[in-house]
């Protein structure tokens, strides 16, 4: 089974519908798991209240590994789980990527051609002792 996972709050609900539609009709996904902030377990929210208090990323994107892990645990070996941000959409079927997945290497991660400094505040680099050009 090919499963698409996405997440949206009310602000991104409409654009997520494009993600889900292209997931089914372009990417050939068998199932789309659409999650919202209301789908996060209250005990998980309570355990991480200091993170979920931030509006940015609906709790600094902590929901992302939460839902991916949830889908992994709910499905069986051999299923393909594809996470795509709700603002993204499919222009072709990603099945060609599946050939890179093996039992030894079950994950395929894409990167974007940007530097970490495009996403990280300079103070974070200083705090971590990583404020050199070769790391940023």
Regions found by a protein language model. Give the residues of each.
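Glycosyltransferase catalytic domains, chiefly GT-A lineage
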Residues: 1-136
């Amino acid at each position: 089974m090919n499963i698409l996972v996405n997440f949206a709050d009310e602000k991104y609900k409409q654009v997520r519908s494009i993600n889900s539609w292209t997931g089914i009709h372009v990417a050939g996904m068998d199932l789309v798991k659409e999650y919202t902030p209301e789908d996060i377990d209250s005990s998980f929210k309570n355990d991480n209240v200091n993170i979920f208090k931030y509006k940015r990323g609906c709790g600094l994107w902590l929901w992302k590994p939460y839902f991916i892990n949830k889908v992994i645990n709910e499905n069986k070996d051999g299923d393909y789980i594809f996470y795509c941000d709700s603002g993204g959409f499919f222009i072709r079927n990603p099945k060609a990527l599946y050939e890179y997945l093996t039992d030894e290497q079950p994950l395929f991660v894409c990167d974007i051609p940007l530097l970490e400094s495009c996403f990280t505040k300079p103070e974070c680099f200083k705090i971590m002792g990583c404020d050199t050009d070769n790391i940023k």
